[in-house]
Amino acid sequence: MEPVDPELEPWNHPGSQPKTACNNCHCKVCCYHCVYCFTKKGLGISYGRKKRSQRRRTPQSNKSHQDPLPKQPLSQRLGDQTGQKEQKKTLES
């Protein structure tokens, strides 16, 4: 084992940093690449801000998940009494 220079910071000691850069691969070799990769990829620990979970929204295409109501004439929607009386007269005769 080589003697370490006491004036050198611990993160600059020889062998403290890997020779290759970290990547996004999650294979077994890359998970054990360095301590950071092990905690991030191997253990799945992230110390960043947590994203707020969003509510599930209805898709834009299906807003109500229901069939649209058939269009009715204005007189039937408002309950026009004259139209109903005429219909009753035709039914009676």
UniProtKB/Swiss-Prot annotation:
Any Pfam family: Tat
Modifications made to the protein after synthesis: Asymmetrical arginine methylation by host PRMT6 seems to diminish the transactivation capacity of Tat and affects the interaction with host CCNT1. Acetylation by EP300, CREBBP, GCN5L2/GCN5 and PCAF regulates the transactivation activity of Tat. EP300-mediated acetylation of Lys-50 promotes dissociation of Tat from the TAR RNA through the competitive binding to PCAF's bromodomain. In addition, the non-acetylated Tat's N-terminus can also interact with PCAF. PCAF-mediated acetylation of Lys-28 enhances Tat's binding to CCNT1. Lys-50 is deacetylated by SIRT1.
Binding residue positions for Zn(2+) 2: 25, 27, 30
Post-translational modification Asymmetric dimethylarginine, affected residues: 52
Keyword check for Signal: no
Region named Transactivation: 1-48
Gene Ontology cellular-component annotations: extracellular region; host cell cytoplasm; host cell nucleolus
Bias kind Polar residues: ranges: 73-82
Residue numbers spanned by region Interaction with human CREBBP: 1-24
Site (Essential for Tat translocation through the endosomal membrane): 11
Spans annotated as Cysteine-rich: 22-37
Keywords: Acetylation, Activator, AIDS, Apoptosis, Host cytoplasm, Host nucleus, Host-virus interaction, Inhibition of host innate immune response by virus, Inhibition of host interferon signaling pathway by virus, Interferon antiviral system evasion, Isopeptide bond, Metal-binding, Methylation, Modulation of host chromatin by virus, Modulation of host PP1 activity by virus, Phosphoprotein, RNA-binding, Secreted, Transcription, Transcription regulation, Ubl conjugation, Viral immunoevasion, Zinc
Domain notes per entry: The cell attachment site mediates the interaction with ITGAV/ITGB3 and ITGA5/ITGB1 integrins, leading to vascular cell migration and invasion. This interaction also provides endothelial cells with the adhesion signal they require to grow in response to mitogens.
HAMAP family in the cross-refs: HIV_TAT (MF_04079)
UniProt miscellaneous comment: HIV-1 lineages are divided in three main groups, M (for Major), O (for Outlier), and N (for New, or Non-M, Non-O). The vast majority of strains found worldwide belong to the group M. Group O seems to be endemic to and largely confined to Cameroon and neighboring countries in West Central Africa, where these viruses represent a small minority of HIV-1 strains. The group N is represented by a limited number of isolates from Cameroonian persons. The group M is further subdivided in 9 clades or subtypes (A to D, F to H, J and K).
Subunit field text: Interacts with host CCNT1. Associates with the P-TEFb complex composed at least of Tat, P-TEFb (CDK9 and CCNT1), TAR RNA, RNA Pol II. Recruits the HATs CREBBP, TAF1/TFIID, EP300, PCAF and GCN5L2. Interacts with host KAT5/Tip60; this interaction targets the latter to degradation. Interacts with the host deacetylase SIRT1. Interacts with host capping enzyme RNGTT; this interaction stimulates RNGTT. Binds to host KDR, and to the host integrins ITGAV/ITGB3 and ITGA5/ITGB1. Interacts with host KPNB1/importin beta-1 without previous binding to KPNA1/importin alpha-1. Interacts with EIF2AK2.
Protein name: Protein Tat
Organism of provenance: Simian immunodeficiency virus (isolate EK505)
Gene that encodes the chain: tat
